[in-house]
Design a protein with these regions (language model features):
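Hydrophobic ligand-binding cavity/cleft-lining segments
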Residues: 1-35
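A short gly/proline-enriched turn/hairpin at secondary-structure junctions
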Residues: 27-33, 40-41, 46-48, 69-70
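Hydrophobic pocket/interface hotspot
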Residues: 16-17, 26, 44, 55, ...
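Hydrophobic-ligand binding "helix-grip"
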Residues: 45, 49-93, 99-101, 130
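A conserved amphipathic terminal alpha-helix motif
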Residues: 100-131
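Structured surface interface patches that mediate subunit assembly and partner/cofactor docking
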Residues: 25-28, 39, 115, 130-131
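Residue-level detector of beta-strand structural context in well-folded domains
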Residues: 5-7, 34-35, 42, 53-54, ...
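Short, flexible helix/strand-to-coil boundary loops that buttress conserved ligand/catalytic motifs
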Residues: 20, 30, 59, 68, ...
Length: 131
């Protein structure tokens, strides 16, 4: 199974990357605890430990690839999440692609990317631009 979603975030790619690449920054936006993984190979957690994984690839201002799992998944089951950033008029196009999530989790994850990532980032950077 695969998921693909996108949005234009009203911020520069470096600003968006700064949130995606650091669970501390993501925690500040979501209000949920996390443990940062700031370099390739490092483990991270986000959303009060509901997502854990490892940073697979980190290309500043362009891409973050993570191996993800939820604690309720069978042991050893991970999916791969790609966050791709492209500068566009009005900010940064953020494309999120997730591959390999368990079929019974597809709808849950697909429904929550806007809540936990896309919508949150748009709201945060829109508020910063206005204020």
């Amino acid at each position: 199974m695969s998921i693909r979603q996108q949005a234009v975030i009203p911020a520069e790619p470096a600003q968006v990357y700064g949130v995606l690449a650091d669970a501390d920054a993501l925690s500040a936006l979501s209000g949920m605890s996390g443990r940062p993984g700031r370099v390739e190979g490092e483990e991270f957690s986000a959303f009060n430990g509901n997502v854990t994984g490892r940073q697979v690839e980190m290309v500043p201002d362009a891409r973050v690839v993570q191996a993800w799992r939820f604690p309720r998944w069978e042991a050893g089951v991970y999916s791969i999440v790609h966050f791709t950033l492209t500068a566009v008029d009005g900010g940064t196009r953020l494309v999120i692609e997730q591959h390999g999530e368990p079929q019974d989790w597809h709808d849950h994850i697909d429904a929550n990317f806007p809540t936990f990532y896309l919508g949150t980032l748009v709201e945060h950077f829109s508020a910063n631009a206005a204020g």
